Amino acid sequence: MTNIRKTHPLMKIVNNAFVDLPAPSNISSWWNFGSLLGICLVLQILTGLFLAMHYTSDTTTAFSSVTHICRDVNYGWIIRYMHANGASMFFICLFMHVGRGLYYGSYIFLETWNIGVILLFATMATAFMGYVLPWGQMSFWGATVITNLLSAIPYIGTDLVEWIWGGFSVDKATLTRFFAFHFILPFIIAALAMVHLLFLHETGSNNPTGIPSDADKIPFHPYYTIKDILGAMLLILILMLLVLFSPDLLGDPDNYTPANPLNTPPHIKPEWYFLFAYAILRSIPNKLGGVLALVLSILILVLVPFLHMSKQRSMMFRPISQCMFWILVADLLTLTWIGGQPVEHPYIIIGQLASIMYFLIILVLMPVASTIENNLLKW
């Protein structure tokens, strides 16, 4: 009798994705982040669901409902901080996952890559709206500043902003709709992640060498299931260290002050995972130019497959491109640092130079490095 795992209409889908999936024998720990992102998403949906049971999306009670969760709800504090720090872990995994894709040329799988970029946008939108919900000072002013950017769009800008706000300022209507969207988006992300996986399984995984591995495949289970469990344990360990020892390490103290439209915080800044994009936005003196640069800083990922000039897929055997990649990583870290600094003399010019470098590396220097390496192969 054939195994039910291989015959049952539902079970065989799971089987072909997680058990009998042929996987390259040499994929490294950089390939763990896909499953870690899945774990992060499930964790965020579960903790978010329990938070939503006690949260109220009304401007008068939102802040105190979060306080109530932390003080009065059984284990509410741990659920709240797992959700807040879970978002940080989510973005760490996302950045690692995208970085892996860039380094090893995984972007050659066009459909998988483009759905991944959409997933990144959706996750960023979800995180932004989630940050507004506690209705602290940084929630309110972050929402005001970021939504206001849309007013830079010619002709329809102002109407668009007021339509999103549901009034003439960020108020009750804005908070309610942000809560609604924040609740629904993770399920859309989950659906997109399944499509992402569907397209990946059409081609099979890439591997560190970038060379097709059809001749050398091993079953996903037990080899990579056990490897993923190790990754998951490390992820949960780091998350729980954050939650239990320094839950507010990555947060902003201003968000412990209830939202006050009459009092602007001295330094408005988003959560750490948006700082690189925020630095790019701020480094351009023109409003519309800044907004375009902000969107392009992420949207540029769509162009990466078309800028691939190398005869090799992976950067494993391309030292010049490797150098460019790590300069890009250093540049992103610089932008993240600048995004959290006040807008004054040394930081402005550093931010502008780092922003120029970011686009220059991706659009010019990486393709040039690839072309040089192609010519070096002829020697």
Swiss-Prot record:
Domain of life: Eukaryota
Membrane topology, as annotated: Multi-pass membrane protein
Keywords for the protein's UniProt record, in alphabetical order: Electron transport, Heme, Iron, Membrane, Metal-binding, Mitochondrion, Mitochondrion inner membrane, Respiratory chain, Transmembrane, Transmembrane helix, Transport, Ubiquinone
Organism whose genome encodes this protein: Pantholops hodgsonii (Chiru)
Residues reported in the UniProt entry to bind a ubiquinone: 201
Binding residue positions for heme b b562: 83, 182
Function comment: Component of the ubiquinol-cytochrome c reductase complex (complex III or cytochrome b-c1 complex) that is part of the mitochondrial respiratory chain. The b-c1 complex mediates electron transfer from ubiquinol to cytochrome c. Contributes to the generation of a proton gradient across the mitochondrial membrane that is then used for ATP synthesis.
Broad class of the protein's primary localization: mitochondrion
Any one GO molecular function term: ubiquinol-cytochrome-c reductase activity
GO cellular component, one term: mitochondrial inner membrane
Additional comment: Heme 1 (or BL or b562) is low-potential and absorbs at about 562 nm, and heme 2 (or BH or b566) is high-potential and absorbs at about 566 nm.
Cofactor(s) the record lists: heme b
Subcellular location: Mitochondrion inner membrane
Residues engaged in binding heme b b566: 97, 196
Cofactor note: Binds 2 heme b groups non-covalently.
The keyword Cell membrane appears for this protein: no
Family: Belongs to the cytochrome b family.
Keyword Hydrolase annotated: no
Subunit organization: The cytochrome bc1 complex contains 11 subunits: 3 respiratory subunits (MT-CYB, CYC1 and UQCRFS1), 2 core proteins (UQCRC1 and UQCRC2) and 6 low-molecular weight proteins (UQCRH/QCR6, UQCRB/QCR7, UQCRQ/QCR8, UQCR10/QCR9, UQCR11/QCR10 and a cleavage product of UQCRFS1). This cytochrome bc1 complex then forms a dimer.
Transmembrane segments: 33-53, 77-98, 113-133, 178-198, 226-246, 288-308, 320-340, 347-367
InterPro entries: Cyt_b/b6_C, Cyt_b/b6_C_sf, Cyt_b/b6_N, Cytb/b6-like_sf, Cytochrome_b, Cytochrome_b_C_euk/bac, Cytochrome_b_N_euk/bac, Di-haem_cyt_TM
One GO term of the biological process aspect: mitochondrial electron transport, ubiquinol to cytochrome c
Name of the protein this chain belongs to: Cytochrome b
